[in-house]
């Protein structure tokens, strides 16, 4: 009775050695964490929805709240104004939101003061597309929405580009002098 049982144990032991790789390497360190994308929290977008009516010269109604799991990343923002079916008429860089101790940033992101000046395209009657693009890296100069990658150090000391991410939100703004007076 012990003979067949012993044979089965020996056979299973021999076969099991084939299933486990014999050349395993154990990492002494965990590889660096990759970059996570930021996002615009949609229920915190102001004004809510996509269609917005705006009388020229009215106060800035636009703001967003951003979440980024990588709390050490500052958040860049760039604002675009488009005429119907056209390339951007203008874009402005907003103030960078600094790193935080929380994933959800407390400070709302609002358009920079330049867009409110009297010659702003949003102060002209008509329909415009107004877009905010956020990034967890730096926008490349004069490149629209292209963002510079993060540099990460690998376990062997080498460097790798860890991509930066963007998110965006678009409002369709109908601007008209015939709208009611501004509301605060």
Positions of PLM-derived features:
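A short beta-strand segment in extracellular, disulfide-stabilized domains
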Residues: 53-66
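Extracellular acidic, Ser/Thr/Pro-rich low-complexity tracts
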Residues: 63-71, 83
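Bacterial signal peptide processing site
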Residues: 18-23
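Short beta-strand elements
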Residues: 140-184
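Surface-exposed, flexible coil segments in extracellular/virion-facing regions
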Residues: 74-122
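Signal that preferentially marks extracellular ectodomain short beta-strand elements
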Residues: 63-65, 101-127, 135-145
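Post-signal peptide N-terminal segment of mature Sec-exported envelope proteins
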Residues: 27-51
């Amino acid at each position: 009775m012990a003979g067949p049982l012993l044979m089965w144990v020996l056979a299973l032991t021999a076969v099991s050695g084939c299933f486990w790789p014999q050349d395993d390497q154990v990492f002494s360190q965990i590889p660096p964490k990759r970059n996570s994308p930021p996002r615009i929290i949609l229920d915190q977008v102001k004004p809510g929805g996509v269609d917005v009516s705006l009388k020229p010269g009215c106060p800035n109604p636009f703001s967003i709240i951003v979440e980024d799991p990588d709390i050490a990343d500052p958040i860049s923002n760039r604002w675009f104004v488009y005429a119907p079916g056209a390339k951007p008429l203008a874009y402005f860089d907003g103030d960078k939101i600094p790193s935080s101790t929380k994933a959800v940033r407390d400070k709302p992101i609002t358009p920079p003061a330049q867009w409110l000046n009297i010659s702003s395209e949003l102060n002209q009657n008509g329909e415009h597309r107004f877009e905010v693009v956020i990034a967890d890296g730096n926008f490349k100069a004069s490149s629209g929405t292209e963002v510079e990658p993060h540099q990460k150090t690998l376990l062997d000391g080498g460097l790798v580009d860890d991509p930066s991410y963007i998110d965006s939100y678009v409002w369709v703004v109908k601007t008209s002098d015939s709208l009611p007076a501004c509301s605060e």
